[in-house]
A protein has these predicted regions:
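Ligand-binding face of N-terminal immunoglobulin V-set domains in extracellular IgSF glycoproteins
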Residues: 40-44
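Bacterial Sec-dependent N-terminal signal peptides
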Residues: 1-22
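Structured catalytic cores of large enzymes
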Residues: 20-37, 52-260
Length: 260
């Protein structure tokens, strides 16, 4: 009885997977894959289309579609929402009205990279979300018989008192997935300071305002039978030091002390 039940379950599960695959947008047409490593607006010109394998001869730009869900990590909980298939992105194509992809025509689309920032309106801060599996996000281009999804023109914003924005808050992160203390799980750290006890990180801040405030968040961990500390130096200043308590480094079930 147990063997019969298991066989029926496996057949049902296999049919479910097959049904999902056959309904995917990828099941029909020719698809061309490309990657991005950051979030922003990207430009695709005629040369790039040719480089990824798309023939631009007799190409009607109105029939171009771009699909992709961004590069953020999938939810951990099965109950959380996730797209079951690739979603079409609204794009803008310069010069598509004549039905020909000319040399000066190009595509603009907004792509989400593998890493992201999550804003908190209550604390007026942002938290960095690192994709621990990939430093690239992938998108797909296809050409079909139907018109692609396009960016719609929004209604103009009329303001009696226009504001000129001259400054903004810049967010920069440095995170390398190099060290896993227990060689298990998804908790990774960067440089190992056991031997080379100093490391230098250069963060690019272009056109930074002099004497403007800076907020720094640093995470670290130690496994040591004695108390240890990690000092953080910003330019020539020493803003703070992490003090780590001792842990039983010889135990098979040892833990680690961390700050972040």
């Amino acid at each position: 009885m147990k063997k019969s039940f298991l066989l029926i379950f496996l057949v049902f599960f296999a049919n479910l997977i097959a049904a999902q695959t056959s309904n995917s947008v990828l099941s029909q047409g020719d698809w061309f894959k490309f990657s991005i490593d950051t979030t922003g607006v990207f430009k695709i010109d005629k040369r790039l289309l040719q480089q990824i394998g798309i023939s631009t001869s007799n190409l009607n730009p109105k029939k171009i579609h771009i699909y992709g869900n961004g590069g953020n990590l999938l939810p951990v909980l099965n109950s959380d929402f996730r797209n079951v298939d690739l979603q079409e992105n609204a794009i803008y194509i310069e010069g598509e009205s004549d039905g020909v992809f000319n040399n000066n025509d190009y595509i603009l689309f907004y792509g989400q990279g593998p890493h992201s920032w999550i804003a908190d309106a209550n604390t007026q801060t942002a938290t960095h979300n690192q994709n621990i599996f990939s430093d690239e996000a992938y998108y797909f281009i296809t050409v079909s018989n139907t018109d692609g999804k396009r960016v719609q023109q929004a209604a103009p914003v009329i303001s009696l008192a226009p504001q000129q924005i001259t400054t903004f808050d810049e967010f920069v992160f440095y995170e390398k997935e190099l060290t896993n203390i227990f060689a298990v799980g998804n908790q990774w750290f960067g440089e190992d300071l056991s031997f080379e006890n100093t490391t230098t990180v250069v963060l690019p801040f272009l056109n930074a305002l002099p004497n403007s405030p800076i907020s720094i968040k640093v995470s670290g961990a130690t496994v040591s039978s004695s108390t240890t500390s990690i000092g953080v130096q910003l330019n020539t200043q020493d803003p703070f030091t992490f003090n780590f308590p001792a842990v039983n480094a010889n135990s098979l079930t040892k833990g680690y002390a961390n700050h972040g």
